[in-house]
């Protein structure tokens, strides 16, 4: 096998690998956007998901509160959201406390 044949084979294998990896990583993105995350982390939590397809229902895989989690997405105002509607993201889990200035759970049910 000549050096030019080897080069063509190597480049072809590299392209096939990149295309296959992109297909696995990408998947179909669900509607909505991930909520803003203004929490600073010293250490990331292990991921609970890698793509939107790992999440049930309408939930999206988003980086939130120090790790990737399945969360209810924020509605875009252009997609029929009400301008008075709170679109800051999902309410935190019970027991969550604001970890940075400006973080709050305004509009969430009280414990």
From Swiss-Prot:
Presence of the UniProt keyword Iron in the record: no
Coiled-coil regions, chain positions: none
Subcellular location: Secreted
Residue span of region Disordered: 80-111
Classification via SMART domains: WAP (SM00217)
Keywords: Antibiotic, Antimicrobial, Disulfide bond, Protease inhibitor, Secreted, Serine protease inhibitor, Signal
Disulfide bonds: 34-62, 41-66, 49-61, 55-70
Leader sequence segment: 1-23
Stretches with biased composition (Polar residues): 101-111
Listed GO MF terms: serine-type endopeptidase inhibitor activity
Cellular component GO terms, alphabetical: extracellular region
Annotated InterPro entries: Elafin-like_sf (IPR036645), WAP_dom (IPR008197)
Main location: secreted
Name this protein carries in UniProt: WAP four-disulfide core domain protein 12
Organism: Papio anubis
Gene: WFDC12
């Amino acid at each position: 096998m000549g050096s030019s044949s080897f080069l063509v084979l190597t480049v072809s294998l590299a392209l096939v690998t990149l295309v296959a990896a992109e297909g696995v990583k990408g998947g179909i993105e669900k509607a909505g956007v991930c909520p803003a995350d203004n929490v600073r982390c010293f250490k990331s939590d292990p991921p609970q998901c890698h793509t939107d397809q790992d999440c049930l229902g309408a939930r999206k895989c988003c980086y939130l509160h120090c790790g990737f989690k399945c969360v209810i997405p924020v509605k875009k105002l252009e997609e029929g959201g009400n301008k008075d509607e709170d679109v800051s993201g999902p309410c935190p889990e019970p027991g969550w406390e604001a970890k940075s200035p400006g973080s709050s759970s305004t509009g969430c049910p009280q414990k």
